[in-house]
From Swiss-Prot:
The keyword Secreted applies. The gene is lgals3bpa. PANTHER family: GALECTIN-3-BINDING PROTEIN (PTHR24410:SF16), HL07962P-RELATED (PTHR24410). This is Galectin-3-binding protein A. Disulfide bonds join C58-C122, C71-C132, C102-C112. Glycans are attached at N137, N197, N200, N204, N412, N432, N543. Residues 272-374 form the BACK domain. Transmembrane segments: none annotated. GO terms for biological process: cell adhesion. CDD domains: BACK_LGALS3BP. Residues 1-16 form the signal peptide. It holds the Pfam family BACK.
Amino acid sequence: MIMYIIWALLFIPVSAQQWTLFDEQAKPKREGRVRLVGGLPSSGRVEVYHDGQWGTVCDDGWDLAEAQVVCRQLGFPGAVSVASGGQYGEGSGPIWLDDMNCKGSESILSECCFKGWGVNDCTHQEDAGVVCDTGTNATNIRQISVDNSLGLSDDLGLLFDSEDGCDFIIAVQDLGEEAELTLCVHRVILMMYPELNITNDTRNLTVDVSQTCQSHVSALIRYLYTRQIDVSATSAQCLYQLAFIFGVQRLMEDVGRVFTALIPEDNTFQTPVSMYEYGLRTGDLVLQENVLQYLSWNCEFLISSPVWSTVSFEMMDALLQRSDLIVKDEAVLLEALERWIQDKGDQISSDKQASLLSHIRFLLIPVDKLYDIQFSSSALYQNNEKLYLTGLLRGFEFNALPFSKIRNQIDNASSEYLPRIYTGDEWSVFINDTTVSSPYYNYNYYGQSNRIQTFFTSAHPSALYKDQKVQWQAQVFLTLQECSNYGVSCNTLPVARFYGYSNQYSYSNIISYNNRLILTCKNQNNVFHVQEFKNDVAVIPTNSSMGLPNPCPDDYSFRFVVRPQYI
């Protein structure tokens, strides 16, 4: 009788709205899932699912280790080879991942190291692909996965909220004081996290959490059930700290990546400085790098903020070693360091002062400011006069002698003659107009668009090249018609172009130009993106291509920076 009922049910007609196993739109999609597009089932362009949308992977740093992770995630034994340069066609939508660094042992691609979702300087012409190994013993038996796990997270969240059947107490207290918060949870959930050392005999757990973060403990414990959590600029610090306390490494990494997208929301710099210190304590290198990059880009604003005097020695040491640090010139950076030393007083030992001073690139200080340094009355100068004089001597040599003369005296691994991103008027031009209007209205008296600027720089910072000029033109295109007018192929908009005229190539044997585009919010004065030019062109990221919450959509300015260096 039971078999008859089941057999009869198979023939019950269904409505036109039924879901079938082969309905691609109705299949549940999971965060971090990957697929291959544009080729065979075992080869194609790699696409990854994030934030409700499929996107591609840039081929920068794309190697066999990354391909192995993708292929194993898809159920193949491994990878045969990688494909780059959009070999399987160009994708659409966001470019989610760039500069991937996989060990090869990760279970899914999103577990690999990367700077952040959507953080890239790529176009879809650089979409990565793979060729997977189908296995020598593969059979023709087809298996179709039935996945009903989509609602599991919500169900477990309801279980936490209801406390039904809870059998374990978490007591939260402020640094040894009496418990101020208790949560009743389920031991079996906590036992899934071996870092907590919960056994069948454990009945409770007491944790010390500062009062400022106690309100976030419940959200953290709920994450242990659901693997879902909302992160904001105000909660990121506490959630990161709590993830460290509870040993949830994956959440720490995820919060660090999310925080990268939220950094621009804090114009005071207090939150990123604090997050860097957390990154130091926990050994989170990705978080440290993301914070340092943002602070380097915004160094001009950071050194004039009250937070500058609170920066730790470790952060200062790391900042001064970076070449992506944006500042008017090297002399301004030295003055900021001297002011920081003055504010710190006796907290910074003479050895540490000397270490920081060694990161100043005296060779690149403008020669007139180099001359003035010898008359400095700063505490740093008084305590390290010999180091200053050595730096001044090397700086004057660099400005007076041809590079061929001093090349053998400079360590190839040294960064002392490599430029940072100097934004002084002699090395950069600023374009503030982002309006698209009448083709006649938006042009100046010379018939040139306000988004096209021509200017001159010296061929090199050395005084030897002071009177040898290179002419540059900076352009910002907001429409396809503008691109077409200047013979530029624009796959997306906006696009920036920056190129030197013919006299640039007169120095090609001794000088190279690694120019940069800086995007700055008009009203907030914070840099949120820095990009290299590839073949004189930079595709300016938008919300969809960055995958980040742009702090000033369609309301930012462009600074084009010339960066000459000896070859």
